[in-house]
């Protein structure tokens, strides 16, 4: 009787472990799809935004606001010229050295940066998509994604088994 109990429990343990492993793999695939679905519209809408870099904020601000409103996961969009954040979809005209609020930016390469908000909802987690315009990387477009919404979308299908998500970006 004891041997039967041990064998039954062992088989049940292995079976449940396999189910949990499959659920984890399914969740990982779902998470990648969610992130792709969030980032793809940013990439598709970047060319009109790149053309705005260098334009006066009075001309670009309305376009930035409309673009940010059309992308549900975007918190804000900002234009950077010569390393200075000069126009934001939320604040309008600005004059802030980008390195002061985001030390990893500007960059000569397209970057995805996980950071914390230092302007609007201070301390809240954000995901920044940076698109440089110039070879020096000092000019570009910064799109700030609301990461709280991304994690909710990732946890959407199966909350009971997986209750928390850790997102690692970069190195």
Predicted regions, residues:
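N-terminal short leaders/motifs
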Residues: 18-34, 81-84, 153-168
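Solvent-exposed, extracytoplasmic
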Residues: 60-71, 102-170
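Extracytoplasmic/periplasmic sensory segments of membrane signal-transduction proteins
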Residues: 38-99, 108
């Amino acid at each position: 009787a004891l041997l039967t109990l041990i064998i039954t429990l062992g088989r049940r343990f292995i079976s449940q472990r396999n189910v949990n492993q499959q659920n984890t793999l399914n969740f990982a695939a779902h998470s990648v799809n969610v992130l792709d679905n969030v980032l793809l519209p940013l990439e598709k809408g970047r060319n009109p935004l790149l053309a705005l870099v260098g334009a006066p904020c009075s001309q670009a601000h309305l376009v930035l606001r409309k673009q940010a409103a059309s992308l549900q996961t975007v918190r804000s969009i900002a234009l950077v010229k010569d390393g200075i954040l000069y126009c934001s979809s939320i604040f309008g005209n600005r004059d802030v050295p980008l390195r002061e609020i985001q030390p990893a930016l500007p960059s000569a390469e397209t970057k995805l940066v996980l950071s914390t908000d230092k302007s609007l909802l201070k301390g809240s987690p954000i995901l920044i998509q940076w698109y440089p315009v110039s070879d020096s990387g000092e000019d570009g477009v910064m799109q700030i994604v609301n990461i709280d919404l991304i994690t909710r979308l990732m946890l959407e299908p199966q909350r009971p088994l997986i209750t928390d998500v850790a997102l690692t970006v970069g190195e």
